[in-house]
Amino acid sequence: MVGFITLAVFIATFAVIYRWAEGSHLAVLAGAAVLVVIGTISGTYTPRMAVQSIYFETLALIFGMAAISALLARSGVYAYLAAGTAELSQGQGRWILVMMALVTYGISLASNSLITVAVVVPVTLTVCFRTGIDPVPVIIAEIIAANLGGSSTMIGDFPNMILASAGKLHFNDFIGGMMPACLILLAVTFLFFEYRQGDWKKAEIPVDLAWVRGEQLRYSDIDHRLLRYGLIIFFITVIGLVLAGPLKVRPGWIAFVAGLTALALGRFKDEEFFSACGGSDILFFGGLFVMVGALTSVGILDWAVAWLEGVTAGHDRVRAILLMWMAAGVTIFVGGGTSAAVFAPVAATLRLDGDGQAAWWALALGIMAGSCAALSGATAGALAMNQYSGFVKRHPELASAAAAGLQFTHREYVRWGLPLMGIFLVLSTVYIAVLAG
């Protein structure tokens, strides 16, 4: 009975989040509190157990990388890179998509996709409307590139930070295990968009010439002091992460110290501090870990492991691949961070021949594929949609041009993202089968 109630509270919490995305950290904290109360009354989940279920290293990673990313973003270098890349595309639709997706991938290697999309999408909208190119395919490609970039490294986005803590993985492990696969999938993404988009002349939209003459691509002013501090802290952090394994130091605490330094030097205003240190994300994942701990305490995750073993007849390689596909499906609805927290204990039970870390890469690739399938799964999907609609509202003279192109809706995104998820999963299945062989 307690297990049923625990599962019901977990599902209800994420139903609320799915319906009202804003304030998701408050919903998770409330759900965590309810589960701790239920567990305490029933004797199945005490406050001590709740604290022990939290991956504090993941929270340290989130804090540190959020602070470093905020410092670099505040310096203006990300916006400058995006504007420079857009200008190099020379107004050609195909090159706008490729180059903006590449810069998105590059920034996402070290910054979470929310920061990346917040910087890149406004530049993309200005460039596309100025050149009469439908921006929707380009923005969709950028969201997918952000997911791939975040999945390539340990510090790129939240799911990998969780898996790093759960699997005791290091920075170099992700470079060797995830980056090659993600680079291949990025190349496949470009081929897919070239095939689907075809003739870019069909993507041309009629734009008010008066708006084009008045709207220029603006380079962001760079604060060289903040940029210098940000780059020094970032490169020292990366060196520390690379050496963390040989030095037997956990990466999260290196990132934590770097984050404290970034906050001290970043000139953040009082109202910016909470956001700069990833406050909402830390609260969300802290509460999420407590909720997943409650599921574990009542045996729900043990049941899931037993079910997987039964379905796959004890073949760990098949189990890892099935886990990857399951994680992709769940991620579409609850997002990558939640899937990572829920499935990490399951991945920890897999013992594969060949690359012993292949189970973690299977889970990471499944989460990445699911994140690409729908806006609800993509960390920055809702932000990109809001930026698009806000841009058109601020420039009503572009309404007819926007109406002539693709409409940036959940349904339109799925038309691109869902087939890509299938392609990613098929290729990732081959990759994991080879690694685990």
From Swiss-Prot:
Disruption phenotype: Weak magnetic response, very few, small magnetite-containing magnetosomes. Near wild-type localization of MamC. Magnetosome vesicles are approximately wild-type in size, shape and chain-like alignment, only a few have crystals. Deletion of approximately 80 kb of DNA, including this operon, leads to cells that are non-magnetic, lack internal membrane systems, grow poorly, have reduced mobility and take-up and accumulate iron poorly. GO terms for biological process: monoatomic ion transport; transmembrane transport. Induction: Part of the probable 17 gene mamAB operon. It comes from the Bacteria. Keywords: Biomineralization, Ion transport, Magnetosome, Membrane, Transmembrane, Transmembrane helix, Transport. InterPro entries: Cit_transptr-like_dom (IPR004680), Diverse_Ion_Transporter (IPR051475). It is found in: Magnetosome membrane. The keyword Ion transport applies. One of its GO terms (cellular component) is magnetosome membrane. The chain crosses the membrane at residues 26-46, 53-73, 95-115, 136-156, 174-194, 229-249, 252-268, 281-301, 320-340, 358-378, 416-436. It is a multi-pass membrane protein. The keyword Transmembrane applies. Belongs to the arsenite-antimonite (ArsB) efflux (TC 2.A.45) family. This bacteria makes up to 60 cubo-octahedral magnetosomes of about 45 nm in diameter which contain membrane-bound crystals of magnetite (Fe(3)O(4)). Plays a role in biomineralization; might regulate pH in the magnetosome. This is Magnetosome protein MamN. It comes from Magnetospirillum gryphiswaldense (strain DSM 6361 / JCM 21280 / NBRC 15271 / MSR-1). The gene is mamN.
